Regions:
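Short alpha-helix in the alpha/beta-hydrolase fold that links the catalytic acid
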Residues: 92-93, 213-225
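Short, proline-enriched alpha-helix->beta-strand connector loops that line the catalytic pocket
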Residues: 196-201
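Short substrate-entry loop that stabilizes the transition state in hydrolases
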Residues: 68-117, 178, 184, 190-191, ...
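Extracytoplasmic/secreted envelope proteins and their assembly/folding machinery
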Residues: 77-80, 93-97, 134, 138-141, ...
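Hydrophobic alpha-helical segments
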Residues: 1-26
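Short beta-strand/loop motif that positions the catalytic acidic residue
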Residues: 203-205
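A domain-start/cap signature at the N-terminus of enzymes
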Residues: 21-76, 102, 129, 158-184, ...
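Gly/Ser-rich "nucleophile elbow"/oxyanion-hole loop immediately N-terminal to the catalytic nucleophile
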Residues: 66-72, 118-162, 172
Length: 225
């Protein structure tokens, strides 16, 4: 089901814009095109691209709407799924298809290993394996910028839960790359870097969220027995 907070976060991030992996043993959601780049065709593309990153196949979904302005560099939004979700789930949840189409923005949904991300000390397969997911996202950005006409001063991050904490980690570690972050339902799980250059960040939480608490960064896992 699509949720109104997701729509709100999406609209918020786009207002900022306009103002300025899976396991190798499992199938890939949505299929793949294999490793390699696409031709420099800018409009009407919707594809999954994969590459080998640190000896693992990692994939992401790119959507370039027909409304992209071919005569100008355009914004890029990376929309990062939460723990146990997939890039397809996040795409359906956030509705960035419609928003990207309406505003001529390139949207990307990365896929985490075992449907998870290493965003800090808690609590996912990718974190336990200490995967370099910040390096992965930066390499995805480089590939999308190389293949499409992207305004590198308008690269934005959003995400849900585990994807929100990874978005904040990316902003903390690489504030020179990203223009702003708007995400939901998690916190920065690292200490602020001394060389961090502040960028706009909006973090959205629900008062009735019983897992990622509004009041602090403790995580409460309910007993499901």
């Amino acid at each position: 089901m699509r949720t109104s907070p997701a729509v709100f976060c999406s609209l918020l991030l786009l207002s900022m814009t306009l103002s300025g992996c899976v396991s190798q043993d499992e199938g890939l959601p949505g299929g793949t095109t294999g490793e390699g780049s696409v031709d420099e065709v800018f409009e009407g593309l919707d594809y999954v691209e994969c590459m080998n990153h640190e000896e693992m196949e990692r994939c992401w979904n790119v959507f370039v709407p027909e409304t992209v302005n071919l005569s100008a560099d355009v914004p890029l939004v990376l929309d990062i799924h939460g723990n146990t979700l997939t890039m397809e789930n996040q795409r359906d949840l956030s509705q960035f298809d419609d928003i990207a189409e309406e505003n001529g923005v390139v949207a990307v949904w990365p896929q985490g290993y075992d449907n998870s991300w290493n965003s800090g000390y808690c609590c996912s397969t990718a974190s336990e394996m200490q995967l370099n997911d910040t390096g992965l996202i930066l390499e995805i950005v480089d590939r999308v910028v190389a293949n499409h006409s992207i305004d590198e001063s308008r690269i934005y991050l959003t995400g849900w839960s585990n994807g929100c904490s990874l978005s904040q980690k990316l902003a903390n570690d690489h504030s020179e790359v990203f223009a702003a972050v708007a995400c939901m339902s998690y916190y920065l799980l690292d200490d602020p870097r001394p060389d961090y250059s502040p960028i706009p960040i909006m973090e959205i939480h629900g008062l009735e969220d019983q897992i990622i608490l509004y009041s602090n960064d403790a995580i409460h896992l309910p007993n499901l027995d």
